[in-house]
């Protein structure tokens, strides 16, 4: 069950990184000019 939950969370993170149109994922996608999330 731990492996399934881990795969589920990784899947959600992959979906979040694949949708830059979502305003909540702007910092995750590295579109923010002030914060250096992705170098």
UniProtKB/Swiss-Prot annotation:
| Tissue/organ expression | Hemolymph (at protein level).
Question: Which keywords does the record carry?
Answer: Disulfide bond, Immunity, Innate immunity, Secreted, Signal
Record carries keyword Signal? yes
Propeptide feature ranges: 19-23
Q: Which Pfam families match?
A: DIM
Q: What induces it?
A: By bacterial infection (at protein level). Detected within 24 hours of infection.
Q: Which domain of life is it from?
A: Eukaryota
Signal peptide positions on this chain:
1-18
Look up the record and report any one GO term of the cellular component aspect.
extracellular region
Q: Name one GO biological process term.
A: innate immune response
Q: What does this protein do?
A: Secreted immune-induced peptide induced by Toll signaling. Has a role in resistance bacterial and fungal infections. The strength of antimicrobial activity appears to correlate with the overall level of expression. Has no activity against the fungus C.glabrata in vitro.
Family membership noted in the UniProt record: Belongs to the bomanin family.
Q: This chain belongs to which protein, by name?
A: Bomanin Short 3
């Amino acid at each position: 069950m731990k492996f399934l939950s881990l795969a589920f969370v990784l899947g959600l993170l992959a979906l979040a990184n694949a949708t830059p149109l979502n305003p909540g994922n702007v910092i995750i996608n590295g579109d923010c000019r002030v914060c250096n999330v992705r170098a």
